Amino acid sequence: VPHGVKPDLFEYDECDPRYTGKVAFIGKMDYQPNVDAVEWYVRKVHSRIGDKIPLIIIGAFPPKKLLRLVGQYDNIEVTGFVQDPYRILKSVLAVVAPMQTGGGIQNKVLEGMAIGQINVVSGLAARPILGAVDGEHLLIADTAEQYVRTLTELRENRERFAFIGEKARSFIRSHYTWEAFEDVYVEGIEQARKSKQLNAE
């Protein structure tokens, strides 16, 4: 089943300076793979760099177990449901998607890419985004060490990575809008029609 992002995200440019220098995770927090991802990040990554790179967890229905874990650490904000999460996502240092479980394409990653943000994701989250290239459209990190190194480098010299957000937006505009899918389907139907004509001759 194809996934398309809302076209207005490509022009989204609202920012909030309160979130500068932080990283954000977004997703419904009653979905177990999202809980698994946040728990992994908090324990393995935030515990090491949270004093310099705070974490914002955006999403409805965070379970009590997660809130108890988060309460053990400084520099973590749990927002719950947010009417306009893109203002936060656009403002942060990077969006993280350290998915450890689950499968399928992550809309949150597509949307983060569509607004021109830098996304640091696990290989599991990146794999379904066909055509996306590590170091060009997003940054893949699978271990805690890779996350720590990547986010630290981003914090120290984000301008060096700014091109990734721009390339991500162009990539999503070309491949993950409903208009792009329509073009692919029309082309497929046309090719099938021509093939049928050739076989009939």
Segments predicted by a language model, with ranges:
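Short acidic/histidine- and often glycine-rich active-site loop of Leloir-type glycosyltransferases
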Residues: 123-140
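Acidic donor-binding loop of glycosyltransferase active sites
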Residues: 90-104, 115-118
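Short alpha-helical segment that forms part of, or immediately flanks, the ligand-binding pocket
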Residues: 86, 107-115, 128-130
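Short hydrophobic beta-strand element within catalytic cores of glycosyltransferases
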Residues: 95, 108-111, 118-125
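C-terminal alpha-helical cap of glycosyltransferases
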Residues: 178-201
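A short, well-ordered alpha-helix in the C-terminal region of glycosyltransferases
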Residues: 160-174, 181-184
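Conserved acidic donor-binding segment of nucleotide-sugar-dependent glycosyltransferases
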Residues: 138-145, 153-158
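Conserved catalytic-core segment of nucleotide-activated headgroup transferases in glycan assembly
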Residues: 5-91
